[in-house]
């Protein structure tokens, strides 16, 4: 029996538990972006009900990002302190609860509705803060470098998949039964997903479906398989954490990555806030039609997002260079996304949809910022590093909706808004080509008190 057992062991196939992990990240991120997009789909009807102008709408759109930015560093600290599984569960559960409660804001009247809506959107943003740093930590723990780009592109492409799936559903709900049901539907589904998360997600060393060969494979490729076991029981003084943060802020590479992510997110936030409104107000579509039309560029963004990761990992295997593997899709994708500006010069509906589809295909290919983070984050503060990255990136979520609101409110047109977003794509390209330099994992220097 012993010899048979040894023989069986020697031919044991490597498990692929990490694939189910990234599937779960994809599902959760889809709900994450679905919840963010609820207001953009229901927004036109809500604005009519409560008398909200474009500038006011811009501020309400930005409420999520104010909190999301504020919550990034605390969220990253919580992830490093208590681990991804527990913190992420509470994040999903709480943001879903606040999403559901937005369906009840019409119990208030007048300005009270606006205050309630802004407050609940703010709380959703605060609760979602650990989500993407959590995604990045989990990918860094589960995936070797040669698979990391694809893993990141899969969960990152969920933002487009969310629009493909949920925009038509939310548009139909708004049209047929009223905007409040959009929030009931998304909030309820999210609460269910939070409990599925607890059953599916485990650390690599504790996953019941992983074998030794898979652990050895991912560890050999640079996966940080002991990340949470090392961090959850260690208390680090604030002075040390601050010293580590200053090292990140002093890195030219990281400054370039932060600026690039800010600019890439300008495209993201245009898409999940103003794009459906653009289709309704600037192009005269019904809410129902806009919900379906918005899914076309989203499909292209999804395809581009997955393709960007595959291309990046293929380049990594062929060249062994993180610079070539990560920068090439980012630069080419952002250049392609600038075609959205051409929408200002055409009035044919299919051409507008086509240019937007190309733009979001390019944006999908170039959305590899989280792969760069998984490649560069110091192992001691991977959650905090991801939180800092996401904080800078999502300042764009505050600025972009408000800036577009002012542009549209002042000019009465979306033409300037599309130019504004296109210029950000160009700045992202320059940031990666000029500022970032060599992409490599940061090794922290000892800090006094450590």
Curated annotation (Swiss-Prot):
Enzymatic reactions: galactarate(in) + H(+)(in) = galactarate(out) + H(+)(out); D-glucarate(in) + H(+)(in) = D-glucarate(out) + H(+)(out); (R)-glycerate(in) + H(+)(in) = (R)-glycerate(out) + H(+)(out)
Keyword annotations: Cell inner membrane, Cell membrane, Membrane, Transmembrane, Transmembrane helix, Transport
Write the protein's name: Probable galactarate/D-glucarate transporter GudP
MF (Gene Ontology): transmembrane transporter activity
Native organism is Escherichia coli (strain K12)
Alphabetical list of NCBIfam families matching this protein = 2A0114
> How does the entry describe its membrane topology?
Multi-pass membrane protein
**Signal peptide (residue range):** none
GO cellular component terms?
plasma membrane
Q: What ranges are annotated Periplasmic (topological domains)?
A: 42-58, 106-109, 175-176, 276-290, 351, 409-415
Q: Which Gene3D superfamilies does UniProt cross-reference here? A: MFS general substrate transporter like domains
Its localization reads: Cell inner membrane
Its biological purpose is as follows: Probably involved in the uptake of galactarate and/or D-glucarate. May also transport D-glycerate.
> Where, in residue ranges, is this chain on the Cytoplasmic side?
1-20, 80-85, 133-153, 198-254, 312-329, 373-387, 437-450
According to the record, the segments passing through the membrane are: 21-41, 59-79, 86-105, 110-132, 154-174, 177-197, 255-275, 291-311, 330-350, 352-372, 388-408, 416-436
Q: What induces it?
A: Induced in the presence of D-galactarate, D-glucarate or D-glycerate.
User: Which terms does the UniProt entry file under GO BP?
Assistant: D-glucarate metabolic process; galactarate metabolic process; monoatomic anion transmembrane transport
Q: Which family does it belong to?
A: Belongs to the major facilitator superfamily. Phthalate permease family.
